[in-house]
From Swiss-Prot:
Bias (Gly residues) ranges: 32-46
S-S bonds: none
Membrane topology reported for the UniProt record: Peripheral membrane protein
A single BP term in Gene Ontology: positive chemotaxis
UniProt keyword annotations, A-Z: Bacterial flagellum, Cell inner membrane, Cell membrane, Chemotaxis, Flagellar rotation, Membrane
Record carries keyword Transcription regulation: no
Species of provenance: Caulobacter vibrioides (strain ATCC 19089 / CIP 103742 / CB 15)
Keyword Methyltransferase: no
Domain of life (superkingdom): Bacteria
Function: FliM is one of three proteins (FliG, FliN, FliM) that forms the rotor-mounted switch complex (C ring), located at the base of the basal body. This complex interacts with the CheY and CheZ chemotaxis proteins, in addition to contacting components of the motor that determine the direction of flagellar rotation.
Protein name (record): Flagellar motor switch protein FliM
Protein's gene: fliM
GO molecular function list: cytoskeletal motor activity
Amino acid sequence: MADELDDQAAMAQWASENPPGGGEGVNEFGDFSGGMGGWDDGGGDGASERILNQDEIDSLLGFDLSGDGSDDRTGIRAIINSALVSYERLPMLEIVFDRLVRLMTTSLRNFTSDNVEVSLDNISSIRFGDYLNSIPLPGILAVFRAEELDNYGLLTVDSNLIYSIVDVLLGGRRGTAAMRIEGRPYTTIERVLVQRMIDVVLHDLKSAFEPLHPVSFSLDRLETNPPFAAIARPANAAILVKLRIDMEDRGGRIELLLPYATLEPIRKMLLQQFMGEKFGRDNIWEGHLATELWTTQMEVRAVLDEQQVPLSRVLNMQVGDTLMLNATSRQPGGAARRRIPLTRGRMGRRNHSIAVRAEAPVDRRKKAVQKLK
């Protein structure tokens, strides 16, 4: 009993010397309580508690406040985004978009009559809702339809590229930055000029997909408010392609977003590897296969005669029965491979072996293959 009174007196003295909210006193009291917790654990009656600081909480939740632009996700955010399919699982996508960059470079040079350089900045996976919230405004969002895939895509043109294209097409001077007027909607002239550029990009996108699968892309509508350009659910995954367009000292960005639902009909084609100048072909393997086919061993049967007899006669056959054939020594027989006629010839004997001398060329026409089917 006296020990309990001594402990209570010591605790009261600590509380009077370290009032709540007192800076260093709180830390010392926290350390003391931690020590007592460890002493109580030894007795089996208490439990120690540790308060996480803000950095540890951010690390646990996966929030990166350093601003270094790293794409690595940790913590709960990594678990949430684990359902996203990486574009690297679709190897043909990178080939298609590389082809798109080359086509756009030529097309935009002809469209603007200026020196245009198109570069591929990044290809990544993102949730559609996160992308809508990250679109820089003001900008123009073009909703386009993939006819053969029966779905939609989204193309975003940022403000810098809009004013640069308008300035170039209307004869702006080189070496001067495009004039920007903020706080107003885009005019009809600006929207029409940007729409013409979008038509060029969609035509090049069609040509980029052509070797893989014919797809026609048609512009559906232009929007300036991201919620009105919703083509998928916020949680749906999509492929985001960022392109940089430079026209000497002017330029901007184009972002192309394709939901995975749009690419699903051609997903098997996107999974194949790129080989040679044509998609999915290997000339070395084709040559090897052709060589092996020429050396393939096949069984050929010589047919002397064919007759149709009743089933009852076949069932009553016994050892020693004789079958009369309607063939003579001068009548040509046939050579076949699994009932496919190959040639005709005469039956005879050569070096104590029965032989067939071919008297007609081997039928190389497609009829033989059709009979096999």
